[in-house]
Design a protein with these regions (language model features):
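NUDIX/MutT-family hydrolases
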Residues: 84-86, 94-127
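Conserved N-terminal beta1-alpha1 strand-loop-helix module at the mouth
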Residues: 124-203
Length: 227
């Protein structure tokens, strides 16, 4: 089965909201929401395909864009490669030139819309900030927590709590304090054994090269299920 190459866009307005479009009921994955874009023609550059599709679908001209993520996904009846770019500037007023409904949503609101399975990594990438903090090594716990608190107060939205010394009880205690500090203000990423997943449901998880695992395996640990 030939893989369909698609150029797609995460389009942001001046306030940071993201433009999504609803697929027609008659289309593949019809009725679900998606990030605008379309097929890359043979011999066509991805950036050129993206500009063409956004002009045809939305009536806008892209003036600033950068690569964001590539996603390969296999449906039972179709294989796709999504070449996703983040569009930060454009001219024209976006409208559904093909009759498709549009919506401007915040990154957090993306979770309220139903997307095709192939779009889920794009949703995750779109919700990540452009930069995030990785905590330094060698700091005493009070100093580290004060630094994290200051970063959150200054608008940092994602923090990775480094664990250079291994996953010992001291790191676990620090993680508990860090979760409380970030609650409702920033996303926290932890490192640790998968047995901890269910104890830190609000945190993200940084998986190292030494922890190869499937999504099913992660879900089993998170829900305490047996494989």
């Amino acid at each position: 089965m030939k893989r369909v190459h698609v150029a797609a866009a995460v389009i942001r307005d001046a306030s940071g909201k993201i433009l999504i479009a609803r697929r027609a009921d008659t289309q593949h994955q019809g009725g679900l929401w998606e990030f605008p874009g379309g097929k890359v023609e043979p011999g066509e550059a991805v950036e050129a395909a993206l500009a063409r599709e956004l002009q045809e679908e939305l009536g806008i001209a892209v003036t600033a864009a950068r690569p964001l993520i590539k996603v390969q996904h296999d449906y039972p009846d179709k294989q796709v490669l999504l070449d996703v770019w983040e569009v930060s500037a454009f001219s024209g007023e976006p409208h559904g030139a093909e009759g498709q409904p549009l919506a401007w949503v915040t990154a957090r609101e993306l979770a309220d819309y139903e997307f095709p399975a192939a779009n889920q990594p794009i949703v995750a990438a779109a919700r990540l900030p452009a930069q995030y903090l990785i905590t330094p090594e060698g700091l005493e716990t009070p100093t580290l927590l004060r630094g994290m608190q200051k970063a959150v107060a200054q608008g940092c939205k994602l923090i990775q709590l480094r664990a250079p010394g291994g996953y010992d009880p001291q790191y676990r205690d620090l993680a508990v304090d860090a979760v409380g500090l970030c609650a409702g203000k920033a996303q926290l990423m932890l490192k640790g054994p998968f047995e901890w997943l269910g104890d830190f449901p609000s945190a993200g998880w940084h998986i190292t090269a030494a922890q190869p695992v499937s999504y099913t395996h992660l879900r089993a640990h998170e829900t305490k299920a047996n494989l």
